[in-house]
Amino acid sequence: MVLSAADKSNVKAAWGKVGGHAADYGAEALERMFLSFPTTKTYFPHFDLSHGSAQVKGHGAKVANALTKAVGHLDDLPGALSELSDLHAHKLRVDPVNFKLLSHSLLVTLASHLPNDFTPAVHASLDKFLASVSTVLTSKYR
């Protein structure tokens, strides 16, 4: 999915407003995903998945860091996320549908924390961005 100049601007502006909360929002999105889509828990059998667990917070920070890197490389998502794509495809073997579920959970999290900034245009741009990230992360499954 190709991001327009307006999409890129919206994504950068929205992610900029996330600021120092990125790791917290990442953890919250994971918690939402685990609650809304319980089958996603199967990839984390060794995690304490309770609210506020250190393991969920730690993985939320990893998710947030990867997205921050992606936002910084909107013109080269495949290059920026190549190692992460390899990890998820070859080592972790995460079912690609889970990226869509996490993307949805992240959009809900961002909308709940940034209600005044989460306009329809920003929503659409973030959705396209997360779909692009998901596409890159699943590209090495083939």
Curated annotation (Swiss-Prot):
Tissue specificity as recorded in UniProt: Red blood cells.
Any one GO MF annotation of this record: oxygen binding
Annotated positions binding heme b: 88
Species of origin: Bubalus bubalis (Domestic water buffalo)
Quaternary structure, from the entry: Heterotetramer of two alpha chains and two beta chains.
Record keywords, A-Z: Heme, Iron, Metal-binding, Oxygen transport, Transport
Annotated residues for binding of O2: 59
Domain Globin: 2-142
Protein name, UniProt field: Hemoglobin subunit alpha-4
Pfam families: Globin (PF00042)
Function: Involved in oxygen transport from the lung to the various peripheral tissues.
Keyword RNA-binding recorded: no
Family under the similarity heading: Belongs to the globin family.
Lineage: superkingdom: Eukaryota
InterPro entries, per the entry: Globin, Globin-like_sf, Globin/Proto, Hemoglobin_a-typ, Hemoglobin_oxygen_transport, Hemoglobin_pi
Any GO CC annotation of this UniProt entry: hemoglobin complex
Cysteines joined through disulfide linkages: none
Biological process terms in GO annotation: hydrogen peroxide catabolic process
